């Protein structure tokens, strides 16, 4: 009897050990599974976007999920660089680390990381163009539809892995590119029957002029990153954070003047003494005039001087798209980046 009891206890313990050793099925935070019903809908959206891209003459490319770390860093600002998913070197990489020398995190990262998951599709595209420039006919219109990864804090509408659908033109400085991309947005949302869409537009040159008038040119990147958070934290907290940077409180009235501008005419009185600001204003006027002549099917183009988009590589007009009937933040964005390929 004692022998049988011991066997019973033994098998019970083995069974419990087996149950406890099994891994609970889960996925990392900020990542998602998609069942078949969702995939049918996603594929319909992707096919609609793809068809619109090709109707406008854009050709497809793909780039690797991983890029060399130096390709990605330094393009998105300090905050963006922190959100890059870094990939540890394979093999016994720690054996090559000098613990006495590599004491801070930046030096340690250089020793153990050579690759990273792509943060967006724009910088890999710039790398692709620089690497294949002898085989490309310019102007070059490309589209790319692939996953990107960001080491962000997961929250509603914000994930660590998500899909981007990009269309870019490279090799021309014509502002008709911006006009066409606004029409392309309008085409896609009309085909998808998404109503009440606003395409907000601003220009980095106008932001540059604003910061210049605030006597804070050296803080431009920091101010733009803070301004990019205005929808999340509100204007008063934006002002507080800018003041903490060292901007004189009296200069914040200039910020108010710009944010209160609702039209090209409002801006012209603020920018008439600035060469850079006037150029940005001319670019915006060209785009508004042409969109007014061509018309949009369902979207609305609107000036938003608070629009900053905190990516370092933008040089001209910037865009952000919102579906006003849904509270999920922006559903699209972009802008002009004239000098990005020159870094490669």
What are these regions (language model features)?
Residues 196-207, 223, 301-306:
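Short, surface-exposed recognition loops or helix-turn segments adjacent to catalytic cores
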Residues 82-94, 216-237, 323:
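Acidic, His- and aromatic-enriched active-site or binding-groove loops in soluble protein domains
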Residues 19-40:
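Generic start-of-chain signal for non-secretory N-termini
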Residues 21, 41-56, 67-70, 103-112, ...:
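Positively charged, Gly/Ser-enriched RNA/tRNA-binding surfaces
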Residues 33, 212-217:
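Phosphate-rich ligand and nucleic-acid binding surfaces
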Residues 62-82, 201-213, 307-315:
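Beta-rich nucleic-acid/ligand-interaction surfaces
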Residues 1-19:
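Short, Lys/Arg-enriched N-terminal segments with co-localized hydrophobic residues
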Residues 65-115:
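Polyanion/phosphate-binding surface patch
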């Amino acid at each position: 009897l004692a022998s049988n009891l011991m066997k019973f206890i033994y098998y019970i313990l083995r069974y419990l050990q087996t149950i406890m050793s099994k891994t609970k099925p889960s996925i990392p935070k900020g990542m998602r599974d998609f069942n078949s019903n969702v995939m049918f809908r996603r594929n319909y959206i992707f096919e609609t976007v793809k068809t619109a891209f090709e109707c406008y003459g854009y050709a497809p490319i793909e780039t690797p999920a991983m890029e060399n770390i130096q390709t990605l860093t330094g393009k998105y600002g300090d905050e963006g660089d922190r959100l890059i998913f870094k990939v540890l070197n394979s093999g016994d990489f720690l054996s090559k680390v000098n613990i006495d020398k590599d004491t801070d995190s930046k030096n340690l990262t250089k020793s153990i990381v050579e690759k990273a998951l792509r943060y967006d599709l724009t910088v890999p595209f710039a790398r692709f163009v620089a690497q294949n420039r002898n085989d490309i006919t310019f102007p070059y219109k490309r589209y790319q539809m692939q996953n990107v990864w960001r080491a962000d804090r997961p929250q509603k509408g914000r994930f660590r892995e998500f899909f981007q659908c990009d269309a870019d033109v490279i090799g021309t400085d014509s502002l008709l590119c911006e006009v066409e991309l606004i029409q392309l947005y309008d085409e896609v949302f009309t085909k998808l029957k998404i109503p009440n869409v606003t395409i907000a537009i601003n220009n980095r040159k106008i932001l540059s002029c604003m910061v210049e008038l605030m006597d804070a040119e050296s803080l431009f990147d920091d101010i733009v990153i803070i301004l990019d958070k205005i929808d999340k934290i509100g204007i008063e907290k934006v002002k507080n954070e800018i003041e903490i940077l060292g901007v004189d409180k009296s200069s914040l009235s200039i910020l108010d003047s710009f944010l209160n501008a609702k039209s090209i005419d409002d801006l012209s009185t603020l920018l008439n003494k600035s060469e850079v600001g006037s150029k940005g204003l001319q670019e915006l006027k060209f785009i508004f005039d042409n969109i007014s002549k061509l018309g949009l099917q369902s979207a609305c183009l609107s000036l938003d001087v608070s629009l900053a988009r905190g990516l370092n590589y933008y040089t001209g007009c910037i865009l952000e798209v919102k579906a006003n009937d849904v509270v999920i933040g922006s559903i699209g964005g972009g802008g002009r980046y004239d000098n990005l390929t020159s870094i490669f």
